[in-house]
Curated annotation (Swiss-Prot):
Note accompanying the cofactor annotation: Manganese or magnesium. Binds 1 divalent metal ion per monomer in the absence of substrate. May bind a second metal ion after substrate binding.
Reactions it catalyzes: Endonucleolytic cleavage to 5'-phosphomonoester
Name of the protein in its database record: Ribonuclease HII
InterPro entries assigned: RNase_HII, RNase_HII/HIII, RNase_HII/HIII_dom, RNaseH-like_sf, RNaseH_sf
Main location as per UniProt: cytoplasm
Function: Endonuclease that specifically degrades the RNA of RNA-DNA hybrids.
GO molecular-function term, one example from the UniProt record: manganese ion binding
The species this protein was found in: Staphylococcus carnosus (strain TM300)
């Protein structure tokens, strides 16, 4: 007796690679429903295969470090929030498990909000260590955004409960006596930096949503501090708040105008 289409779909889910799917007896079944199920499973497996291949490519920096020193403790570091008009810059330092396989990791800007949340939850549950570092709007104004970002990153490293031996950093060098590799667009090239990017983004977005409750009218829950139309309109109506960066335009001009300078 032939299997039902539903049964075939269930059996196809037990096939976990394209080679096995190509060799499956179900390819000989000419029923339209079976062929559609095979095509659907093939698409899923191709997507999974692409994720694995991309992930393996993003482990290249980590693998090179470990090939030289198998005992290396690698820490990925990234930040979010350099460009907004309001809110802190948030950095995250992450030390992944040795057997990590967080497929789907990528630059946080390329990952959907839903997938970013899932990845963040998985990372928080399974990483060896992670910690955040924050530089406030006041510190950004007193220093500059570059130096404030360095401060946030160093605080994240200091807050770790594990001491790293090699830092992988997204386009930044830190004045620390620890081996480090600065990688341009590192959040798209290193799984460790991508993990830090995801966690930093989720952490800062959560903070900005909370700030939206404290300061309604600026649309922080959507713009997370960036200079969107709704945010700028909120500034015109309500004025600036302590979380605004006074060294960033147009906030700077508004402050000077009020001081009549």
């Amino acid at each position: 007796m032939a299997h039902s289409i539903k049964e075939v779909k269930a059996l196809l889910k037990e096939i976990h690679n394209l080679k096995a799917l190509d060799a499956s007896e179900w390819n000989k079944d000419e029923r339209k429903g079976v062929q559609q199920a095979i095509a659907s499973r093939r698409k899923q497996l191709e997507k999974e295969s692409a994720l694995v291949a991309h992930y393996e490519e993003m482990t290249r920096y980590e693998e090179n470090i470990l090939s030289d020193n198998p005992e290396a403790v690698i820490c990925g570091i990234d930040e979010v929030g350099r460009g907004p008009l309001a809110g802190p810059v948030v950095a995250c330092a992450v030390i992944l498990n040795a057997d990590h396989a967080y497929y789907g990791l990528d630059d946080s800007k390329k990952v959907s909000a839903a997938n970013r949340q899932k990845l963040s939850e998985a990372l928080i549950e399974k990483t060896t260590a992670y910690a955040y570092g924050i530089a406030t709007p006041e510190e950004i104004d007193d220093l500059n955004i570059y130096q404030a970002t360095q401060v946030a990153m160093m605080r994240a490293i200091e807050n770790l409960n594990v001491t790293p031996t090699h830092l992988l950093i997204d386009a930044m060098e830190l004045p620390l006596d620890i081996a480090q590799t600065s990688i341009i667009k590192g959040d798209a090239k290193s799984v460790s930096i991508a993990a830090a990017s995801i966690l930093a983004k989720e952490h800062r977005d959560t903070y900005m949503r909370q700030l939206a409750e404290q300061y309604p009218g600026y649309d922080f829950e959507h713009n997370v501090g960036y200079g969107t139309k709704a945010h700028l309109e909120g500034i015109k109506r309500l004025g600036i708040i302590p979380e605004h960066r006074k060294s960033f335009e147009p906030i700077k001009s508004i402050v000077l105008e009020k001081l009549d300078i």
